[in-house]
Amino acid sequence: MEKNGTVMDYLRWRGDLPFTRDGFNEVDDLVLCIISYINFRRFDDLKTTDPTRAVALPEVAARLTKEDEQLGLSELDYIPLMRLAAETERFREVRMFGFTHEYDEVKEMQFDAVSYLLPDDTLLVSFMGTDTSLVGWKEDFNMSYHSAVPAQIRAAAYTEEIAAACPDRGLRIGGHSKGGNLAAWAAIHIPAPLQDRLLAAYNNDGPGFSHDMVDSAAYRRVADKLHTYIPESSIVGILLEHAEDYAVIDSSNRSIMQHEPMS
């Protein structure tokens, strides 16, 4: 994309190219990670973990209303992005399943995820970032000094569960903000046979890990599959440590607002 192009621009410019002509890339991951912020809680059919019952992305987009606006911290509405994606040749055959919203005040856990079956016969597991709840913020704070928080542990278990339901598909994992950290955590902690199926894990401006984690054998085992993207003025994405390669990208926003994935 040109300098300061957004994901909406990407859909308009490249949406006519199916994955068979131009393979899945990091911007496709970001598009689907942004969609994972939308409030799908009233869509019971998306909660199935059976991939044969997955719902086409355009069908879900057609049912969205104002009450389904995204659950994250952004003031933007992500529904127009999903509707635009649903109209493109590139995304219209994507299917969705495995939506879950898990909130536990006692465990101090906020966990949201949804999975996508892609037309290239791969699977993308996508984790949402922090919502507006106090528990979500407390869990973010806990990440700075606990070796693991409940959402991280749940992310690895969720990935294993969803991947087991799709044994013939290559695996991708992604997320934005805390969701990006969860994606990397899951990649590091899933069983070795599943790591062999892992094509990539995308951390979009999410925190890193403790020094002990990035210096561990578990981390090194998948380090070449971890892809981290941060904006020029990243704040969240430079928290804690990253030992994997990362790319600095342009943003149409300034300062902390560069954390907004639509920019």
Predicted regions and their residues:
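Alpha/beta hydrolase fold serine-hydrolase catalytic domain that processes acyl esters and thioesters
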Residues: 1-26, 34-44, 51-113, 118-123, ...
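Gly/Ala-rich beta-loop-alpha elbow adjacent to hydrolase catalytic centers
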Residues: 174-179, 183
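Short glycine-enriched nucleophile-adjacent loop
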Residues: 183-192
